[in-house]
Amino acid sequence: MADQLTDDQIAEFKEAFSLFDKDGDGCITTKELGTVMRSLGQNPTEAELQDMINEVDADGNGTIDFPEFLNLMARKMKDTDSEEELKEAFRVFDKDQNGFISAAELRHVMTNLGEKLTDEEVEEMIREADVDGDGQINYDEFVKVMMAK
């Protein structure tokens, strides 16, 4: 399934994988998965985290390595309920629930994920997505960016 991904997608997933793989050992544990999910405002139980890992843990060793992670991401991209997932993701970024993602909100979420971005980098991310030029990202703009990945 991962063989349908472009080089760009694989590179992007490698970056995401390293955000999860806090200790850099090449595997994502339930603890690391939990840390990242909580930084995104989710609150999964230990059992839910284990289920998520078991879902993609092909070799049954209790952790997710990069090839397993790629398969998970390829599956997620094919999921038809991605509309709901996009809304959920948008809500994570849109802290004040005003229907827009501001530079401050974007910076906040990226910082929680351990990505220290300069003001310039945050502004650049907003500019790339901001079709109507109002300085923030609305839901339609967010969907365009997420679907273009």
UniProtKB/Swiss-Prot annotation:
Alphabetical UniProt keywords: Acetylation, Calcium, Metal-binding, Methylation, Repeat
Gene3D superfamilies named in the record: EF-hand (1.10.238.10)
Residues given in the record as Ca(2+) 1 binding sites: D21, D23, D25, C27, E32
Residues annotated as binding Ca(2+) 2: D57, D59, N61, T63, E68
Residues that hold Ca(2+) 3 according to the record: D94, D96, N98, E105
Disulfide bond entries: none
GO molecular function ontology, one term from the record: calcium ion binding
SMART domains listed in its UniProt record: EFh (SM00054)
Pfam families found in the cross-reference section: EF-hand_7
A single GO cellular-component term on record: cytoplasm
Residues modified to N-acetylalanine: A2
Modification sites for N6,N6,N6-trimethyllysine: K116
Residues that hold Ca(2+) 4 according to the record: D130, D132, D134, Q136, E141
Domain (EF-hand): residue spans on this chain: 8-43, 44-79, 81-116, 117-149
Protein purpose: Calmodulin mediates the control of a large number of enzymes, ion channels and other proteins by Ca(2+). Among the enzymes to be stimulated by the calmodulin-Ca(2+) complex are a number of protein kinases and phosphatases.
Note: This protein has four functional calcium-binding sites.
Family membership: Belongs to the calmodulin family.
This protein's name: Calmodulin-3
Species annotation: Oryza sativa subsp. japonica (Rice)
